[in-house]
Swiss-Prot record:
Localization annotation: Plastid, Chloroplast inner membrane; Plastid, Chloroplast thylakoid membrane
Assigned protein family: Belongs to the PspA/Vipp/IM30 family.
Coiled coil: 92-246
Keyword Transit peptide recorded: yes
GO cellular component: chloroplast inner membrane; chloroplast thylakoid membrane
Lineage: Eukaryota, Viridiplantae, Streptophyta, Embryophyta, Tracheophyta
Chain spans, region Disordered: 265-317
Protein name listed in UniProt: Membrane-associated protein VIPP1, chloroplastic
Chief place of localization: plastid
Self-association state and partner proteins as the record states: Homomultimer. Complex formation involves interaction via the central alpha-helical domain (71-286).
């Protein structure tokens, strides 16, 4: 007997074949004398998802380490001082030069010992050769043979020492050449260091000046200058107006003086006219002065004729 799920029960969607595998197994129970069997579905996760998870995890770790390194480099770069870095670089180069000189001295000492050993071996070889000659002259061939064996041993040792000595000389020449190159580089680095330090100091000064200028409130300063300019212009206008008023006052006073002078002249002329003869001849076109002394305006004949004609026309209308 099998128990099947009703049609309305939930169903699992079939997973992709690349990510998981399914296997159905029958499970027997003691319920109803073991006649009931259940079918279980076992899900096995394939290695594909596991590999994908590992790849994503490693990618995230790489990105995180890259970000941390970038921030660390940025922090270190912000703390780097060009002057101190240059001084430290020169000190390290001097330390390397000292170590190279010490190594050269040690190699030279070893070369000197090899030379002494080589000379001693050659000297011993020559001595045993002379002894072999002496023994042969005395008729002792066995002794001469032993002397030649000793001589050969020292000669072989001298040859070996000669090869080592030649090799040591090459090492010494290489060390001396590298030492001279390093010395020249250090001298050049010191010159560049002074130049770069001066440029770095100039750049720092320029940066500080730029920061100071950037912190200055130029808008407030310009507005203050504009206000002071307006104030100065107002003061100049006020001074100009006061000067103009003072000039007008002086001109008015002089005009009054000139007017009084004209009045005086006119009065003087009236006195002269009144004191003269009342029936004297006047200039043509003017009437005589009355006996009362009141002056009447002079009349022009042409004007009087035109005036009479106008009066006639007015009366006709």
């Amino acid at each position: 007997m099998e128990i099947r799920a009703p049609p309305t029960s939930l169903r699992l969607a079939p997973p992709p074949p690349a990510s998981a595998s399914f296997r159905r197994t029958a499970l027997r129970t003691s319920f109803l004398n073991g006649s009931v069997s259940l079918r279980l579905i076992q899900v096995r996760q394939s290695n594909v998802n596991r590999f994908k998870c590992n790849g994503i995890r490693s990618n995230l770790l790489d990105r995180f380490s890259r970000v941390v390194k970038s921030y660390a480099n940025a922090v270190l770069s912000s703390f780097e001082d060009p002057e101190k870095i240059l001084d430290q670089a020169v000190l390290e180069m001097n330390d390397d030069l000292t170590k190279m000189r010490q190594a050269t001295a040690q190699v030279l000492a070893s070369q000197k010992r090899l030379e002494n050993k080589y000379k001693a071996a050659e000297q011993a070889s020559d001595d045993w050769y002379r002894r072999a000659q002496l023994a042969l002259q005395k008729g002792d061939e066995d002794l001469a043979r032993e002397a030649l064996k000793r001589r050969k041993s020292y000669a072989d040792n001298a040859s070996s020492l000669k090869a080592q000595l030649d090799q040591q000389k090459g090492v010494v020449e290489n060390l001396v050449s590298n030492t001279r190159v390093l010395e020249s580089k250090i001298a050049e680095a010191k010159q560049k260091k002074d130049t770069l330090k001066a440029r770095a100091q100039s750049a720092k000064t320029s940066t500080k000046v730029s920061e100071m200028l950037g912190n200055v409130n130029t808008s407030g300063a310009l507005s203050a200058f504009e206000k002071m300019e307006e104030k100065v212009m107002a003061m100049e206008s006020q001074a100009e107006a006061l000067g103009q008023l003072a000039t007008d006052d002086l001109e008015g006073k002089f005009a009054l003086l000139e007017t009084s002078s004209v009045d005086d002249d006119l009065a003087q002329m009236k006195k002269e006219i009144s004191g003269s003869s009342s029936k004297g001849e006047l200039p043509p076109g003017r009437t005589a002065v009355s006996n009362s002394g009141a002056a009447r305006p002079f009349r022009d004949i042409e004007i009087e004729n035109e005036l009479n004609e106008l009066r006639k026309k007015a009366n006709e209308y």
